[in-house]
Amino acid sequence: MLTMKGENMEELTTAESMVMKTIWDHPYEMALQEIMKLTNETYGKDWKSQTVSTYIAKLVKKGFLRMNQSGRNATYEIIIPELSYQQEQSRKFVKFWNRGSVAQFLTAFYKETYQRGNRGVEKKH
């Protein structure tokens, strides 16, 4: 698993992904309260600050975020860009499901999309 500096990129849980996606969608340094508010609004959650704080701490530990402390105020800065994570997840998906063959993946994806698009369509004579 190669990342930006040759380090291992850790997997995100579903909850961590929601918090991280919220931060990626607002690419500026954010405080806990804003992250909590936007995550709850976006994903229909009712997470309290302690819950979101726990997820953020895990994201910092996994190397996705950096905490910047100024007195009692902390903001969080993105370290791993969204595109880097998407590329890594896509690479792992193709490697696992299609033995690393992008062509095989695209063929399967095209067939599924084409079949789904043609369901219920009657041929006209």
Regions found by a protein language model. Give the residues of each.
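Key DNA-contact positions within bacterial/archaeal DNA-binding proteins
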Residues: 50
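Short helix-coil junctions and helix-kink-helix linkers
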Residues: 37-47
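Short, cationic-aromatic polyanion-contact patches
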Residues: 70-89
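Short alpha-helical segments that sit at the start of domains
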Residues: 1-29
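A short, conserved structural fragment
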Residues: 60-70
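Amphipathic alpha-helical dimerization/coiled-coil segments
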Residues: 88-125
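Short, hydrophobic-biased segments on the C-terminal half of alpha helices
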Residues: 53-57
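Short acidic, hydrophobic short linear motifs in intrinsically disordered regions
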Residues: 29-39
